[in-house]
């Protein structure tokens, strides 16, 4: 029966097919002939640009269907709940590689053209449309088999197969780990990994999206910890995911983890740090609350039951509840169905040989103490440790009311007590002044574990930003980190000092905070030096790069001189910089350089054959200070030299580089809005661009200007990001008004009488 009409509902992204008579009830086959577009929007079926070793520009054809873009490639019911098997055939030039989800079962000449072949793939398991993938391009590969017999390949640009070996080794290790952990085997005969040159990002599932994404974000860390215990990966998780999620979730313009979605354009909106990072953080807290053994048992029950069916969040809670006997649904609903998280205030009293703790919870708000009538409540799994054994929980309790008292048996008066062991609970802690004072020696002598030192410092910084404590208190605590050896702790400290520096760039004492940065980072800089020492690990190399970059940016004299010397040798080919030192050296010479320095950097960018090196250069270009050079960098950002998705980090780098850069980047975005918006078509990159460009402002009127601009230039998929940015600008302005003078006085006082370590 031939269809008689196609009615397109563009707004809802649907098409209605009309037939001449009523179709019979039952199973049928719908055959649709269609012509699609190989687009350049980094979504659906699109072309991805790459350069051959000889400098020729070519294109690969690749797919990115998550969340709602399979419909751009072929007509389908593009909803995660509607599943099917897929038989895929690709007709491709015979010198190109064709890949899809399944293994190739036939490859034969195409009848009409001897330069083309038809590649047929095996039928997929039952799955959602967003999981379908295909790639056509020029690639080399390396391959191995995992110990359970799955063929693993890593595809690389031609001539770069060597660079795929580490990824191959890791992939082959992870498959058996997941199989053992979940007691569910990998369901396909092969797995291909491929890095795509132009790629926006992977994302998933609607209302229950967070479960998919949050879980994936958490389990990847669990797997890395299993394969590479020396990476100290959970400390990195706290810095990269946990604190980032808390920062967003403290805003009035946050959203619960579980969000119902009405329209496809809203899907990109909920793929933010809440879905991924808060999702992962609450699953980490849940795993800790249940214990690994029962968690694995519950996961296996859940996965076995819902292997090819749709599952909702509640189904997972039920399986975990059955496995652990704990009230999982009641606890987790307080974390997934309401936005935000609690601030736990704690004070202590010694009662003979015991320590009495008084705990109370209120919602933590970035704007200061919660003042609403009905304060939301959480069921909070709380772990408490003491200096007797800083790595073990002395006590675990479930705080299921606004206030509670807890007694710790046999705690001597000279022992410190800390909440949130391992920074696992998704809450912030405010200690009474005596409790905080007692924890400082634990930072200095490193008896507090790294992840707890990081969590303590981050909580204090957030409390200061929210106006609950003074920023000066945090600066004093930061000075206690003088003996800190841990990369991730320094990384978080550095990030917070960067936020403070950006804030104080609105004042006339910006140089004083740079002196503070130099004082904090100089001792570790001297200990590390410029060159690797025998026995150093991967994290020491990262720390060296971080510290030298911080000192160089702040204008530390000897660091600047050495960076210039090494840069000159690098450019002249006398002594090539190691990968770990390139970013800090490039950043330092650009920040304190001139037009010639920028020209050399742009030349290095053009000559680089590794995308990693190009990205490294793009990220530091914004450090340049003169207005005309900043303009040159912004123009470069939109040029053919920069891949579309990397334009965002160049413009963001300019905005984050200096006071002038911030204004210039915002003007540039307004002037080039149409081109930028068309380029990213409402995907998540537009949200990222807006966030990076305006989040550093700290003047009330800028919030109004940003809001007004986007009212007249709507970006529907970035609506929530815009609201969050405006809120952050107002919060920055309030923070500056509140604390600028006391910070200035403290920095002057330090200058007059330098602290002794």
What are these model-derived regions, one by one?
Residues 47-66, 198:
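Short edge-strand/loop segments of extracellular domains
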Residues 1-4, 377-379, 383-387:
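Solvent-exposed beta-hairpin/edge-strand motifs
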Residues 18-19, 158-165, 269-270, 443-447, ...:
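Second-shell loop/turn segments in exported
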Residues 242, 353-354, 358, 372, ...:
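Long, ordered, helix-rich scaffold segments
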Residues 63-70, 75-203, 218, 254-255, ...:
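Hydrophobic helix-coil surface modules that form long, contiguous segments used
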Residues 1, 11-13, 60-62, 121, ...:
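Hydrophobic alpha-helical and helix-loop surface patches within well-folded domains
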Residues 1-52, 75, 113, 404-412:
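A surface-exposed beta-strand-loop module
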Residues 82, 372-380:
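Short coil-to-beta strand junction motifs in C2/discoidin
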């Amino acid at each position: 029966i031939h269809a008689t009409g196609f009615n397109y509902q563009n707004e809802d992204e649907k098409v209605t097919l009309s037939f001449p008579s009523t179709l019979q009830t039952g199973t049928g086959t719908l055959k649709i002939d269609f012509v699609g577009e190989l687009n350049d929007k980094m979504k659906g079926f699109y072309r991805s640009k790459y350069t051959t070793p000889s400098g020729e520009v070519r294109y690969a054809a690749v797919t990115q269907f998550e969340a709602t873009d399979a419909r751009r490639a072929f007509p389908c019911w593009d909803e995660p709940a509607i599943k099917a098997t897929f038989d895929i055939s690709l007709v491709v030039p015979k010198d190109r590689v064709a890949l899809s989800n399944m293994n190739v079962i036939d490859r034969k000449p195409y009848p009409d053209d001897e330069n083309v072949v038809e590649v047929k793939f095996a039928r997929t398991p039952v799955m959602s449309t967003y999981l379908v993938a295909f790639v056509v391009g020029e690639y080399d590969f390396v391959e191995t088999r995992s110990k359970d017999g799955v063929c693993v390949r890593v595809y690389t640009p031609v001539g770069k197969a060597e660079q795929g070996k580490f990824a191959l080794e890791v992939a082959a290790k992870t498959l058996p780990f997941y199989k053992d952990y979940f007691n569910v085997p990998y369901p396909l005969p092969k797995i291909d990994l491929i890095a795509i040159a132009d790629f926006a990002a992977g994302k998933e599932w609607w209302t229950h999206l967070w479960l998919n994404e949050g879980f994936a974000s958490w389990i990847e860390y669990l797997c890395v910890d299993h394969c590479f215990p020396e990476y100290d990966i959970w400390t990195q998780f706290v810095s990269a995911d946990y604190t980032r999620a808390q920062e967003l979730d403290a805003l009035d313009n946050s959203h619960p983890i579980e969000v119902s979605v009405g329209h496809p354009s809203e899907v990109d909106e909920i793929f933010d740090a809440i879905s991924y990072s808060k999702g992962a953080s609450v699953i980490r807290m849940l795993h800790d609350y249940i214990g690994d053994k029962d968690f694995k048992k519950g996961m296996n029950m859940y996965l076995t039951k819902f292997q090819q069916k749709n599952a909702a969040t509640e189904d997972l809670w039920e399986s975990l509840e059955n496995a652990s006997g704990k009230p999982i649904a009641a606890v987790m609903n307080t974390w997934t169905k309401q936005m935000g998280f609690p601030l736990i205030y704690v004070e202590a009293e010694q009662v003979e040989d015991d320590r009495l703790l008084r705990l109370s919870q209120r919602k933590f708000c970035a704007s200061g103490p919660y003042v609403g009538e009905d304060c939301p409540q959480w069921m909070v799994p709380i772990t408490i440790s003491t200096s007797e054994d800083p790595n073990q929980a002395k006590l675990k309790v479930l705080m299921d009311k606004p206030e509670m008292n807890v007694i710790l048996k046999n705690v001597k008066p000279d022992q410190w007590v800390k909440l949130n062991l391992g920074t696992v609970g998704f809450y912030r802690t405010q200690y009474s002044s005596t409790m905080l004072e007692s924890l400082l020696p634990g930072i200095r002598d490193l008896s507090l574990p790294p992840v707890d030192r990081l969590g303590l410092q981050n909580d204090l910084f957030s409390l200061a930003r929210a106006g609950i404590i003074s920023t000066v208190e945090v600066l004093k605590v930061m000075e206690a980190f003088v003996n800190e050896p841990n990369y991730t702790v320094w990384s978080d400290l550095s990030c917070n000092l960067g936020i403070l520096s950006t804030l104080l760039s609105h004042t006339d004492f910006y140089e004083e905070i740079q002196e503070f940065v130099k004082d904090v980072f100089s001792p570790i800089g001297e200990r590390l030096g410029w060159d690797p020492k025998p026995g150093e690990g991967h994290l020491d190399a990262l720390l060296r790069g971080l510290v030298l970059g911080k000192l160089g940016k702040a204008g530390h004299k000897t660091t600047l001189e050495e960076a210039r010397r090494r840069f000159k040798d690098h450019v002249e080919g006398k002594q090539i910089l190691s990968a770990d030192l390139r970013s800090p050296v490039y950043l330092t010479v650009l920040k304190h350089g001139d037009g010639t320095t920028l020209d050399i950097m742009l030349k290095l960018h053009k000559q680089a054959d590794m995308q990693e090196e190009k990205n490294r250069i793009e990220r530091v270009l914004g450090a340049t200070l003169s207005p005309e050079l900043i303009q040159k960098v912004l123009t470069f950002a939109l040029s053919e030299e920069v891949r579309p998705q990397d334009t965002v980090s160049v413009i963001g780098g300019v905005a984050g580089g200096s006071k002038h850069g911030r204004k210039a980047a915002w003007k540039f975005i307004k002037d080039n809005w149409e081109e930028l918006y068309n380029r990213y078509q409402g995907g998540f990159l537009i949200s990222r661009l807006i966030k990076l460009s305006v989040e550093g402002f700290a003047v009330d009127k800028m919030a109004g200007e940003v809001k007004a601009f986007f009212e007249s230039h709507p970006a529907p998929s970035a609506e929530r990001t815009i609201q969050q940015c405006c809120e952050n600008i107002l919060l920055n302005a309030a923070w500056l008004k509140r604390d600028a003078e006391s910070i200035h006085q403290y920095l002057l006082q330090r200058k007059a009488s330098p602290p002794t370590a």
